[in-house]
Amino acid sequence: MLFSVFYLSLFLSVGLLSARRAVPDRSAAVIVPLGCGFGVSLLAVLPALFAVVLGFTLPAAALAAVAAAGIGAALLYRGTRLRGMAKDPDGGALWACLLPVVLITLYLLHTHVLHLVDGAYHTGQSCYGDMPMHLGFIKYIAQSGEFLPRYPLLGGTHRFGYPFLCETVSSVFVVLGADLRTAYLLPVLPAFLSVYGMFWQLARRVTDSAGKACLAFYLFFMGSGLGFAYFLGSADSFAGIFTGFYTTPTNFVEKNIEWVNPIVDLLIPQRATLFGWCVLLPAVYLLWRFCYEGERRLWPWLAALVLPLPLLHTHSALALVLLCLVGGVYTLAQGPRRKTLLPWLGLAAVCGAAWLCQMLPTVLAQS
């Protein structure tokens, strides 16, 4: 387990250096969640690159660590340092906003992911279907070493069409010797920090108000409507949300209620959504600065960040494409065509080539 923690720390350290290099004018309140996004992206990309040649094996994981260390060394050589970050008067508001939700999330992860109680593994109702699938994929990729992976339940005749990089970010820790629960949780922790922190920073950037960013954060992550009110009529009904078998307000068909909370119904059970948003929200933050604030130098960092996005969460990749199309039209209408167009062409060329190479033998091959 200690070796796995060290391995993750290496990738997160390189991610923090990358974030610092990309936005050197920002405070730790931006660098930390943005760095987590970069770190998870690297954790998805580098082991997979070497696994294409060597299989998903220990040598591939070791070479990925060497490559990550090389990137970190190059950034340090170029003078990138984590000390001396800018001060942010709104940094306290971010951490005060995030801390209660982070604590709730940590508790839910503890109780929902292979929680051993009296010899039995416990989870939450939202994970009944998703978690067995994810655990099976994580273990299979690590044990078989086959890459690109194939669906084990289909006799190995079909390659994954599912965005499997959300599984390999945990499979690599199984290869390194971690138990399944540890491997499952290790990359999830920085992913949540990236999602929460970069949502707040994006809202802060768009609204130009820390107060509005806090309001947007809680409306989104703690919202979902009042469908749970039907379960407040008795103590037994309310307790059933936590102890019953499919007795949550998520799909309460008797009252035509669908109550979906982003944390408990999407991010905790659906790893593809979590890791997709972990990269998408930092990417949209960089896209906002690149597109609407004229920071054209950010396009290589944006491209590097989103390299694994189609095989982390295909829907997030599609969302980013649509946002880029809107942003591209906006910027072309605002400034000189040549100066404006070149960064967009660079972003499109890098992402288009990388994403096509990923999707042709996987998602598109199974369509």
Give residue spans per PLM region.
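Membrane-embedded, hydrophobic transmembrane alpha-helices
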Residues: 1-91, 103
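Membrane-interface alpha helices of multi-pass inner-membrane proteins
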Residues: 264-267, 286, 299-314
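Membrane-interfacial entry segments at the cytosolic side of transmembrane helices
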Residues: 53-63, 85-95, 210-213, 297, ...
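Perimembrane helix-loop-helix junctions
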Residues: 287, 292-297, 319-351
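Alpha-helical transmembrane segments at the extracellular/periplasmic loop-to-helix junctions
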Residues: 1-14, 96-101, 130-132, 269-285, ...
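Transmembrane alpha-helical segments
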Residues: 11-18, 45, 72, 195-203, ...
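Active-site lumenal/periplasmic loops and adjacent helix-entry segments of GT-C-fold
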Residues: 103-279, 315
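Hydrophobic alpha-helical membrane-interfacial segments at the cytosolic entry of transmembrane helices
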Residues: 94-103, 215-219, 304, 336-361
